[in-house]
């Protein structure tokens, strides 16, 4: 019987079986570990992504509340933050939050556009822009969310879309501490 040195057809079988069992054990434990979450309303989201989404939502809401508070302080107004209608963020030296806010002023809902620049490592926040866009009815704001990208006859939504397109095409924000212009 000839036998090659270092090779035997049966010597690797126990090791392969052990490796397969280990792989099955790891795969069975993965849904309960910090990997995937396979139940409830977050069924297909990776937990790390879900945490990142929640963190970004919290950062946007914090920036929105800061913008309203700064406006109230500087203008002597009494606006109340209601909700974020739309949020975008741009990473510059820090984060520039481009927000469409619904606020309540004396019981009347209005839309405001706000841009807030945040550098958390310096404990820095600045409102770059905060301006009234138009009046808001609950139905109009909800319709805008539901009909994103669709034509609509609602003048509030149409004017907001026109404003957004104008901003994207023509407006650039020059931040005084930068030597460059960042398009928003």
UniProtKB/Swiss-Prot annotation:
Subcellular location per the Swiss-Prot or TrEMBL entry: Secreted
Record keywords: Plant defense, Protease inhibitor, Secreted, Signal, Thiol protease inhibitor
Motif (Secondary area of contact): 90-94
Predominant location: secreted
Record GO biological process: defense response
Signal in keyword set: yes
Transmembrane stretches, start-end: none
UniProt function note: Specific inhibitor of cysteine proteinases. Probably involved in the regulation of endogenous processes and in defense against pests and pathogens.
Protein name: Cysteine proteinase inhibitor 3
Originating species: Oryza sativa subsp. japonica
């Amino acid at each position: 019987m000839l036998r090659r040195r270092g090779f035997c057809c049966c010597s690797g079988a126990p090791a392969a079986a052990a490796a397969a069992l280990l792989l099955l054990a790891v795969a069975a434990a993965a849904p309960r570990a910090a990997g995937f979450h396979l139940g409830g309303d977050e069924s297909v989201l990776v937990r790390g992504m879900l945490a990142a989404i929640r963190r970004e939502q919290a950062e946007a809401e914090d920036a929105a509340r800061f913008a309203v508070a700064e406006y109230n302080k500087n203008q002597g107004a009494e606006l109340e933050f209601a909700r974020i209608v739309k949020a975008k963020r741009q990473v510059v030296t820090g984060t520039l939050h481009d927000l469409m806010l619904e606020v309540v002023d004396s019981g009347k809902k209005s839309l405001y556009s706000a841009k807030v620049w945040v550098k958390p490592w310096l404990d820095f926040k600045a409102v770059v822009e905060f301006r009234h866009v138009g009046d808001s009815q609950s139905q109009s704001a909800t319709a805008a969310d539901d009909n994103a990208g669709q034509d609509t006859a609602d003048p509030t939504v149409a004017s907001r879309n026109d404003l957004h397109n104008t901003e994207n095409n023509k407006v650039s924000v020059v931040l005084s501490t930068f030597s460059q212009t960042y398009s928003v």
